[in-house]
A protein has these predicted regions:
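Short C-terminal tail/terminal secondary-structure segment
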Residues: 2-5, 246-259
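Short, small/polar-rich loop/turn modules that mediate ligand/substrate recognition or access, typified
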Residues: 94, 182-187, 245-247
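Active-site helix of classical SDR
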Residues: 128, 166, 174
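Alpha-helical segment proximal to the catalytic Tyr-Lys
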Residues: 133, 179-183, 243
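Residue(s) in the substrate-gating loop at a strand-loop-helix junction
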Residues: 149
Length: 259
């Protein structure tokens, strides 16, 4: 085996939740480019189909879109069952679904809180649980990658209390699952992106004053590119190259959390 073979995903299968847009789509494309067959999921079947076709065209790997609601146990279980039926098994799980509510904490409604928590935390737990069970029962030494945020470590912007709470919990859940499932050869790690130009951050990027303020605090002096800046780290964490790396948080932020 050569060093490049360690990073190859040929013959592997992956499920990327939140894979039709932004960071999730970038990760899905990277996995496919490394040879994996991939299912991407989001709420919109149209978005899934469009992104899956683009990924297949650009990488030559199989990519299928399956719409799902990951905020419910039933929705996640159906998604996992359909993915297994489509790909045969799941070697790699990426949790990258995202949503947020931006408003002062005193104005938050219970529905606002639940809307974010159900996707950013509950959905991640349900997906890890369902896919983890599949990996254990099938004796698959799988790879789970959860997408957290730098906001779990530093609160980079105000008015996102539910988002920050969820992302912090995802980091600790990642460590807990890593400890619990290491005995099965399953690794669980988290990525913590900084400021990437995605639909979720569009409201910030389109405000010139905020955009300039953020760039002043990023040593790399640019925002992340979801199509390229997650490629290397996601392939590494999904491959045999990271089989002894688990329970870790990887900051992909252009140096933001260093200062």
């Amino acid at each position: 085996m050569t060093i490049l073979d360690l990073f190859s995903l040929r013959g592997k299968t992956g499920l990327v939740i939140g894979g039709s847009k932004g960071i999730g789509k970038g990760i899905a494309q990277s996995l496919a480019a490394a040879g994996a067959s991939v299912v991407i999921s989001s709420r919109s079947q149209m978005d899934c189909d469009k992104s899956a076709a683009a990924i297949t065209e650009s990488t030559g790997s199989r990519c299928i879109g399956i719409a799902a609601d990951i905020s419910t146990k039933g929705g996640v279980e159906v998604l996992v069952a359909q993915t297994v039926a489509t790909l045969g098994h799941i070697d790699i799980l990426v949790n990258s679904a995202g949503t947020t509510v931006r408003k002062p904490t005193v104005d938050f409604t219970e529905e606002d809180w639940d809307r974010v928590q159900n996707v950013q935390l509950k959905g991640v737990f349900l997906a890890c649980q369902a896919v983890g069970r599949h990996m254990i029962e099938s004796q698959i030494k799988g790879r789970i990658i959860n997408v957290s945020s730098i906001n779990a470590r530093v609160v980079a912007r105000p008015d996102i209390v539910s988002y920050v709470a969820a992302k912090g919990a995802v980091m600790q859940m990642t460590k807990a699952l890593a400890v619990e499932w290491a005995q099965y050869g399953i690794t669980v790690n988290a990525l913590a992106p900084g400021f990437f130009e995605t639909e979720l951050t569009k409201v910030l990027m389109e405000a010139p004053a905020i955009r300039e303020e953020l760039l002043r605090h990023i040593p790399a002096k640019r925002f992340g590119d979801p199509e390229t800046d997650f490629a290397g780290i996601s392939i590494c964490l999904a491959s045999d190259a990271s089989q002894y790396t688990t329970g870790q948080i990887f900051y992909v932020d252009g140096g933001y959390t260093c200062i």
